[in-house]
Amino acid sequence: MHKKDKEVTDKQVIEEILTKSEICRIAIHDTEYPYIVPLNYGYCDNTLYFHSATIGKKLDLIRINNKVCFEIEYSSQIIQHEESCKWTTNYLSLIGFGEIEIIDDTFDKKKGLDIIMSHYGKTTNNVYNDTQINNLVIFKLPITGLTAKRSGNGDN
């Protein structure tokens, strides 16, 4: 990281970013340009989980090359100032890497959905019928590396 004073190494802060943020963006390799997609996600045991339709560009690209980069930001706030060039943003963010796996097993798909649902607050009584399970894809992304950053106080 270029600005070491902004680097976050505290594992508790990194866990907070991973567990409290709402959107994760994944960047997937495409032929000429990267393809980036914002996704709902769940986080458990150093692994991110996503759901998707069974067809589409994202899925096609992942099947070709499952190495991805992801970005998550948390607690961002624009700080205004009388002088235009002194405007800034307070935030916590992280950028990570990994290789996405497509989960095929029905039991593991339900487990992935439970992790996603729990991330957004529904921790019990999740029921999924076979049609729903068969009409979606669950991705599992074990995190192989990441860096975290704080700009400003980052705890708005």
Regions found by a protein language model. Give the residues of each.
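Extreme N-terminal tail/first-helix region
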Residues: 1-19
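Short Pro/Gly-enriched beta-strand edge/turn motifs at strand-loop
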Residues: 20-23, 122-124
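Short beta-strand segments
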Residues: 21-54
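Broad gene-expression machinery/nucleic-acid interaction feature
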Residues: 23, 36-38, 67, 91, ...
